[in-house]
Amino acid sequence: MREIVHIQTGQCGNQIGAKFWEVVSDEHGIERDGLYKGTNDMQLERISVYYNEIGSNKYVPRAVLVDLEPGTMDSVRSGPLGGLFRPDNFIFGQSGAGNNWAKGHYTEGAELVDSVLDVVRKEAEGTDCLQGFQITHSLGGGTGAGMGTLLMSKIREEYPDRMMCTYSVVPSPAVSDTVVEPYNATLSVHQLVENSDETFCIDNEALYDICFRTLKLSTPTYGDLNHLVSFVMSGITTCLRFPGQLNSDLRKLAVNMVPFPRLHFFMTGFAPLTARGSQQYRAVTVPELTQQMFDAKNMMAASDPRHGRYLTVAAVFRGKVSMKEVEEQMQNVQNKNSAYFVEWIPNNVLSAQCDIPPRGVKMAVTFLGNSTAIQELFKRVSDHFTAMFKRKAFLHWYTQEGMDEMEFTEAESNMQDLIAEYQQYQDATVEEEAEYEEEVPADEES
């Protein structure tokens, strides 16, 4: 089977990672002690993608948990799923990275990285046919951002032909932990552009908006935000974990979603949105789901898709859904909003379906969009970066860890290039390509 090794780094990465394992274990009928108590054969059919079977009926996640301070690890270990993970797979330092990307990437993180790679190697050796790695981390801190990207480049060196997929929480001024988030995020994106194959952008600001506006929560906690993230992660990985036809592994997903290798940053969405603890009391229909899913308010990245165009889209419907109806609705959306889809990629909207719905709802859909509007998110980070960098604010924190200003300049220009590339493809039309084709025969005649 095509296994995936999961790595969670830093406080944020470990928190959303733990939530992910909670949801996935629940969907596959795996108890907190790792024993299978499920009822449906489909739960076991592709269980080996994320779990290692040890002994009869006992499963252990293929997860590596990393942090530069012991605090988060302790809370995962004492949390509901503490007994599920392999004890050797907790790797932590003592000092913390203090929200400093350079500490995570060059000093503290670099000291710990070899012991992490040993565990990753051990997990990779325990697979039949490894398809790739998924990393959960935030881009605003020190460990998840700095050490997370260091791990990615090291894993890339060792497994150059395996997929690398990241769930990256992008910082936002609305929900800010520290003042240097724009630095950490820009330095991280610089790495993600080169070393990741698919990055699912999750944005705290958008998650907060969903909690306020849609779920009517007056004071959302990180627990509420992580609850939303776990919906999306569960939905994206549905195709990987349950038998299905479309996007059934990371590489196929990338083939369908990434038209140009650098443009692999996806917006994610989920419908129907429900708050923690409140289940839905009305049935949803496919048209409602489709409409909700394309709604800007449902996006987990604070970019408005109406300000850009979709290069590619994938939707994963779950529950007892008629595929015919899904196809009709998706076609309908494209016909009505054709201006928002680039016309030079044919069949760029795909739908998959899985019979097992998420807990508590009859039907749900997860949305993945490669939209040029994601540049808004990068612009926002980049503007904050530039404002600070031109005054060299807080730069000494990074230079005293051995970083060079040149690295900041490079990261800044790489971010600007990325924004420009998205803009270029947003403006591209079929006419431009057609003109080019018409010019060629003219030369032959002369």
UniProtKB/Swiss-Prot annotation:
- Protein name according to UniProt: Tubulin beta-1 chain
Q: Which GO terms describe its biological process?
A: microtubule-based process
Looking at the record's lineage, which domain of life comes first?
Answer: Eukaryota
Could you list this entry's UniProt keywords, alphabetically sorted.
Answer: Cytoplasm, Cytoskeleton, GTP-binding, Magnesium, Metal-binding, Microtubule, Nucleotide-binding
**InterPro entries, A to Z:** Beta-tubulin_BS (IPR013838), Beta_tubulin (IPR002453), Tub_FtsZ_C (IPR008280), Tubulin (IPR000217), Tubulin/FtsZ-like_C (IPR037103), Tubulin/FtsZ_2-layer-sand-dom (IPR018316), Tubulin/FtsZ_GTPase_sf (IPR036525), Tubulin_C (IPR023123)
According to its record, what are the GO cellular component terms? cytoplasm; microtubule
What the entry lists under PROSITE patterns is as follows: TUBULIN, TUBULIN_B_AUTOREG
- Residues binding GTP are 11, 69, 138, 142-144, 204, 226
The record's subcellular locations are: Cytoplasm, Cytoskeleton
Q: Which residues bind Mg(2+)?
A: 69
Q: Which family does it belong to?
A: Belongs to the tubulin family.
Q: Which gene encodes it?
A: TUBB1
Say yes or no: keyword Cytoplasm present: yes
Main subcellular localisation: cytoplasm
